Amino acid sequence: MVKVGIIGGSGLEDPNILLNPTAISIDTPYGQPSDHLIQGTINGVECVLLARHGRKHDIMPGNVNYRANLWALYSLGVDVIIASTACGSLKEEVAPGHLLFPDSVFDRTNSRKATFFDGTFSGAPGVSHIQAHPTYNEKLRQVLISTAEKCKLVHHRTGFGVCIEGPRFSTKAESMVFKSWGASLVNMTMMPECILAKELGIPYATTALVTDYDCWKDEDQVTAASVMKVFAANVEKAKTLFIEAVAEIGKIDWSAEILQTKTAARQSIMISPDVEVEFLKVPKT
């Protein structure tokens, strides 16, 4: 049966969504993940929960050890990953309290370790020129969308986010430029998480929890307090979504999807095909 990794953003680090939760401490070649990983089940499906910012929310977006987080989930054998992320809206119709299921991302980060293939001692062999499109696994994305429809949660099926370095919010000039690009969201944690999952050959999709209108909208000033107030209201929606989505994911045979994802990741590496990459092993056909 499939094993689901869940990366929870702000507010979604509650281990009580799991039955029989067990905390697991893991060290990785890339250092420590953000917190203990919590293993348990949801609707009979094995799950591993990781709080992206730590359970005390004391790790800012640029300091999250994304590589360690993804490697830790891989080492516990997760087959697919679903995530949540708080976002500001760049479109009037994408209102605070809504959910959006991104289909792409524009990367504006500048100081994050964004690949496992970095030539260091701990790094994977070779150089990976991973295809960044499609950014998210479409089959997994559709499960989240259909679950939101089933749960009658107000949501948007498509849209892309601009991922900024943070931890500050956008300037007015930045917000207006991002809006002019046609982006739906501005965010601080979409990258490089989705790309690292692709490098590991793990299907990944995220749910954007809209907390505010970014500062392009003059009448709404973005503050940490206002963001957290709306986010607190979103948390219960996201929990409902994930609990139901995990049940749906558990009904699906993911073997072909995982094979395709791992094969694509292996083919992206500039290295002799005879070199074995342990974490991208696929069954012989």
Curated annotation (Swiss-Prot):
Phosphate binds at residues 10, 52-53, 85-86, 189. It is found in: Cytoplasm; Nucleus. Pathway: Amino-acid biosynthesis; L-methionine biosynthesis via salvage pathway; S-methyl-5-thio-alpha-D-ribose 1-phosphate from S-methyl-5'-thioadenosine (phosphorylase route): step 1/1. It is an enzyme of class 2 (transferase). It comes from the Eukaryota. GO terms for cellular component: cytosol; nucleus. The record marks 170, 224 as: Important for substrate specificity. GO terms for biological process: L-methionine salvage from methylthioadenosine; purine ribonucleoside salvage. Catalyzes the reversible phosphorylation of S-methyl-5'-thioadenosine (MTA) to adenine and 5-methylthioribose-1-phosphate. Involved in the breakdown of MTA, a major by-product of polyamine biosynthesis. Responsible for the first step in the methionine salvage pathway after MTA has been generated from S-adenosylmethionine. Has broad substrate specificity with 6-aminopurine nucleosides as preferred substrates. Belongs to the PNP/MTAP phosphorylase family. MTAP subfamily. Homotrimer. NCBIfam families: MTAP. This is S-methyl-5'-thioadenosine phosphorylase. It comes from Caenorhabditis briggsae.
